[in-house]
Swiss-Prot record:
The lineage of its organism: Bacteria, Bacillati, Bacillota, Bacilli, Bacillales. It comes from Brevibacillus brevis (strain 47 / JCM 6285 / NBRC 100599). Disulfide bonds: none annotated. Binds 1 lipoyl cofactor covalently. Its cofactor is (R)-lipoate. The glycine cleavage system catalyzes the degradation of glycine. The H protein shuttles the methylamine group of glycine from the P protein to the T protein. Keywords: Lipoyl. This is Glycine cleavage system H protein. NCBIfam families: gcvH (TIGR00527), PRK01202.1 (NF002270). PROSITE patterns: BIOTINYL_LIPOYL, LIPOYL. Residues 22-104 form the Lipoyl-binding domain.
């Protein structure tokens, strides 16, 4: 199971990749493995505001429905429309093709509350 070093991670198993004042958000390889085959992804609309630690969408697998929790606060500026037709990308490419949303960061200090790859890996191994 991989946890790219250039990402930050939340306790709820979301990842964040920061590019300038924008953050790409998705779920980790650990989360998709726990969920099993993803069959549907529900995401917010462009223009919506998400709040750190609050639900912003959900993923449905053959096993369960799981809420997605915002790792940062911001305004949604892009949604990955590919996931509507191909939710299985979350299983096959959780860090590359299956980013879920892009937000304009409201407060970069929130990133300090997230874990680096080593801390996240230690948490999921407990």
């Amino acid at each position: 199971m991989e946890f790219p070093k250039n990402l930050r991670y939340s306790e709820e198993h979301e990842w964040v990749r920061v590019e300038g004042n924008k953050a790409y958000i998705g779920i980790t390889s650990f989360a998709q493995a726990e969920l099993g085959d993803i069959v549907f992804v529900e995401l917010p609309e462009v223009g919506a505001t998400i709040q750190q630690d609050e639900p912003f969408g959900s993923v449905e697998s053959v096993k369960t429905v799981s809420e997605l929790y915002a790792p940062v606060t911001g305004k949604v500026v892009e949604v990955n429309g590919e996931l509507e037709d191909a939710p299985e990308l979350v299983n096959s490419s959780p860090y590359e093709q299956a980013w879920m949303i892009v937000v304009e960061l409201s407060d970069t200090a929130e990133l300090d509350k997230l874990m680096d790859a080593d801390k996240y890996e230690a948490m999921v191994k407990e």
